């Protein structure tokens, strides 16, 4: 979706997360990226990010994508900065986070969003996707050559199923590629990011009830 959030909102999130991103250690392997920095706990650290998490258009699509369960919840939040020289990330599915459990084909457990804080280009490491691969089985093997770059301008958002094969691209530019990921999962699954610990309880008074429920302070099923 092009131009879903404003330049003012991008600047706010960049300000709020700058110190956390600078202090984050680069990854230690090819999956996390040795020139890639990640930091999470966006509900607590970035009030601007809460608007992305609660965006009504995104929540509507996520609800439809995960409609085979009674509820869905916030799964993971991160700012990811792919630096110059980063290698391509191995192609994967996000829902492999659940110990590689072989969920039935077509049964999505997560729904993902990638919000562009900078332009996403093929040169700076735009997320690479394999359209239609959410229908494939778990034993498929792919390389970067099988993918296409999800190029988009800053302020846009990429939506995709947790069963879609994808990966971060190689950054051959001189600039960082920075994005916010917000993932949602079925209400009865354990979240990848523990929202109960990442958000101090003394902040609850400042958070709307619908956000608290999305964080997991609600029934996990019916």
Place the predicted regions along the sequence by residue.
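Short Ser/Thr-interspersed hydrophobic loop/turn segments at strand-loop and sheet-helix junctions
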Residues: 79, 119-120, 163-164
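Conserved double-stranded beta-helix
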Residues: 136-159, 163-164, 169-222
């Amino acid at each position: 979706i092009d131009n879903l959030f404003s330049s003012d909102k991008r600047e706010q999130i960049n300000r709020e997360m700058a110190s956390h991103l600078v202090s984050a250690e680069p990854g230690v392997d090819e999956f996390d990226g040795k020139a890639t920095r990640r930091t999470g706990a966006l509900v607590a650290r970035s009030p601007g990010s809460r608007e992305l998490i609660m965006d009504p258009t995104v929540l509507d699509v996520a609800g439809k994508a995960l409609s085979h369960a009674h509820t869905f919840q916030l799964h993971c939040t991160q700012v990811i900065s792919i630096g110059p020289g980063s290698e391509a990330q191995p192609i994967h599915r996000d829902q492999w986070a659940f110990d590689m459990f072989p969920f039935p084909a077509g049964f999505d457990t997560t729904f993902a969003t990638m919000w562009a804080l900078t332009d996403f280009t093929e040169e700076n490491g735009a997320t690479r996707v394999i359209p239609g691969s959410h229908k494939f089985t778990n034993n498929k093997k792919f390389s970067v050559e099988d993918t296409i770059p999800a190029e988009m301008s800053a302020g846009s958002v990429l939506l995709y199923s947790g069963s879609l094969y994808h990966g971060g691209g190689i950054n051959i530019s001189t600039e960082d590629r920075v994005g916010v990921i917000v993932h949602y999962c079925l209400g009865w699954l354990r979240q990848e990011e523990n929202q109960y610990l990442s958000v101090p309880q003394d902040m609850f008074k400042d958070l709307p009830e619908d956000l608290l429920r999305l964080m997991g302070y609600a029934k996990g099923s019916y």
